[in-house]
Amino acid sequence: TMPSERPDHRLQELWQPIGIVGCITAFNFPMAVFAWNFCLASVCGNSIIWKPSPHATGCADAIKKIWDKVAGEHKELVLVYKGGNDEAIALCKDPNISLVSATGSTQMGKELAPLVSARLGRTLLELGGNNAAIICPTADLDLTVKGVTFSAAGTTGQRCTTLRRAFVHENIYKEFMEKLHAYYATLKVGDPSDASSQ
């Protein structure tokens, strides 16, 4: 509840559960993306069916095991539905699923959204991030180079917020590119289990 502009009145917001939320996650950051969806769904009184990437089912197993341990009689509020494309399609077509939240490529969204909308379902799509940096003449170029590099190469570039392009003011373009090339040359790319790899 919150105050109203009208004297002696208050405004009240009520969240109405919508039912079952289907959550389709990609291979990268599978637990984080599920957690965001789960928190939003559950705080509004909804259950969730999680269809993880076939490349990250171990993460789903671990989360489900923890959930079952702490959920008591509410274990069924989180279900895990493993599989690939066929299972994702089935989840999208199921009229019992009120909302499908999917994270992945733009192509995946183009294929799944029509399946949900054909039954007048709801979608929440996080697809194909395409991020840019705008670098102004007043920028601290040493700091900017580090930020741009981390945004483009951090976590091997496998995240939706990965930097794909930079717009650099012409007055600083040459200096920025020299610093960027020099910084990239210091990156140690290698086996991810090797602590010296970046």
Task: Describe each region flagged by the PLM.
Residues K69-V70, Q107-Q198:
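ALDH superfamily catalytic-core signature
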Residues M2-L143:
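Rossmann-like NAD(P) dinucleotide-binding subdomain of oxidoreductase/dehydrogenase enzymes
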